[in-house]
UniProtKB/Swiss-Prot annotation:
It comes from Mus musculus. The keyword Phosphoprotein applies. One of its GO terms (cellular component) is alpha DNA polymerase:primase complex. This is DNA primase large subunit. Its cofactor is [4Fe-4S] cluster.
Length: 505
């Protein structure tokens, strides 16, 4: 198709105007989006952003940040999820638009607690660090200006005048490197971290910061900006949650699981009850291993433990009949009357299989669900051992599982950094004698099936898993399923007016 010169000019101007909305592949997210989007797109963008941030967290503890391997794997994740990452790529507008909108959606979900805010800020900072590291040098100054960072690169004459002082404060810079390196004049108060580390030259209240070090200042500014914005959003959240279209999604997005939900398995019935003791030591994650041990020792679990463990067993293949037999046998060993069990407990088991009440088929809990909701109290055994156990108790538990001392140290370091799922992944690698398990652990049932795949050479249960439905994200908890149902009940063509949310950011 050919266009006249006038039409080509109009098309070019329209493209220029769109690109002007997002001049760079990275930003400080200073202005919220104001367009209308469908509820379906709202939900999809939110889940894609969660996937990206989870990938950033996993890569950050698996690889040294900034290394070639880290950079290439992160770029691949960003490209796969269709977010922006490089300048001067074709079709820049849509990835940058997705990046912009999804960031603000997650602000609504992750402003609700200090733990959520801390996690969100850290992953967003790592994303910004990556994008800045591949930003062309000739784009840095305009990015700083657009981000309201008033740092000006000094002239070559000024740089030559202070060459010796700058190099003395930055040992990694030689004269040749400095010649091609931009140096920024930054107010002293913005460079305190560099000053404390004696990594910057100061003069008359200003720090002279080479480009390689300016990222530390940019990240500090971004952290402060985002932290304030999340606090503001948190104060306004009750008003946002009054919107019946948003409330179900936002309430559960922060601990949602976007992978396979393990609710329907082709291997149902292929696990026998006499296998469970053996499987618990070989293929159960620590959270389920401790629940099984507590059940065998005490012949009872409280409601939180029964729900977490019961749905896990359902997910690995126990039928309703097997589940009723398993729990009844164990509770009777604890001197419970069989009639009491039938009246007080069997209903709840049938309910979890979708045979009572609303006939809803409950799904096994994901790691995020276990970590972030219903913390265990005195006498409880549910929860995540890496999140809910103190360091000494966790150390003793790992020792009882025959984890070597070096592995325990690595696990405790990961827990100290709040990387609970990665700590569990390290436990998996230690107990299965693999250097790299090759997956990101997000679900206890995933742990089980990956374990079986390794132990059986991929010939047993793992092959029986039904494939996840790729077009849709399937939250793993009942509440998130309710959230998705609430959204699905609305016409997907209904539009979400993002401009109406502007005052909450």
């Amino acid at each position: 198709m050919q266009f006249s010169g006038r039409i080509r000019k109009k098309l070019r101007l329209a493209g220029d105007q769109r690109n002007a909305s997002y001049p760079h592949s990275l930003q400080f997210y200073l202005q919220p989006p104001t367009e209308n989007i469908s509820l379906t797109e709202f939900e999809n963008l939110a889940f894609d952003r969660v996937k990206l941030l989870k990938a950033i967290e996993n890569l950050g503890v698996s690889y040294v940040k900034g290394t070639e391997q880290y950079q290439s794997k992160l770029e691949a994740e960003i490209r796969k999820l269709k977010f922006s990452y490089r300048e001067n790529l074709e079709d820049e507008y849509e990835p940058r638009r997705r990046d912009h909108i999804s960031h603000f959606i997650l602000r609504l979900a992750y402003c609700q607690s200090e733990d959520l805010r801390r996690w969100f800020i850290q992953q967003e900072m790592d994303l910004l660090r990556f994008r800045f590291s591949i930003l062309p040098k000739d784009k840095v100054q305009s990015f700083l200006k657009d981000s309201h960072l008033h740092f000006e690169a000094i002239s070559d004459e000024e740089k030559t005048l202070r060459e010796q002082d700058i190099m003395a404060s930055s040992p990694s810079l030689s004269g040749i490197k400095l010649e091609s390196e931009s140096v920024y004049k930054v107010p002293f108060a913005d460079a305190l971290d560099l000053f404390r580390g004696r990594k910057v030259y100061l003069e008359d209240g200003f720090a002279y910061v080479p480009l390689k070090d300016i990222v530390a200042i940019i990240l500090n500014e971004f952290r402060a900006t985002l932290s304030k914005a999340l606090a503001l959003t948190a104060r306004s959240l009750p008003a946002v949650q009054s919107d019946e279209r948003l409330q179900p999604l936002l309430n559960h997005l922060s601990h949602s699981y976007t992978g396979q939900d393990y609710s329907t398995q082709k291997n149902t019935g292929k696990i026998s009850l006499d296998q469970i003791d053996s499987l618990s030591t070989k293929s159960f994650p620590p959270c389920m291993r401790q629940l099984h041990k507590a059940l065998r020792e005490n012949h009872h679990l409280r409601h939180g433990g029964r729900m977490q463990y019961g749905l896990f067993l359902k997910g690995i293949g126990l039928t309703l009949e097997q589940a009723l037999q398993f729990w009844k046998q164990e509770f009777i060993r604890g001197k419970m009357d069989p009639d009491k069990f039938d009246k007080g407990y069997s209903y709840n088991i049938r309910h979890s299989f979708g045979k009572e009440g609303k006939r809803t088929d409950y799904t096994p809990f994901s790691c995020m669900k276990i970590i972030l909701t219903n913390p265990p109290g005195q006498g409880d055994y549910h929860g995540c051992p890496f999140r809910h156990s103190d360091a000494e108790l966790l150390k003793q538990k790992m020792q009882s599982y025959k984890i070597p001392a070096s592995g325990i140290s690595q696990i405790l370091d990961l827990v100290k950094g709040n990387h609970y799922q990665v700590a569990c992944q390290k436990y998996f690698e230690m107990t299965h004698n693999v250097d790299d398990c090759g997956f990101s652990l997000n679900h206890p049932n995933q742990f089980f099936f990956e374990s079986q795949r390794i132990l059986t050479g991929g010939k047993d249960i793992k092959k029986e898993i039904s494939q996840p439905e790729t077009p849709q994200h399937k939250p793993s908890t009942q509440k998130t399923r309710d959230a998705a149902s609430a959204l699905a009940s609305l016409d997907s063509s209904l539009e979400m007016d993002l401009e109406g949310l502007e005052e909450y950011f």
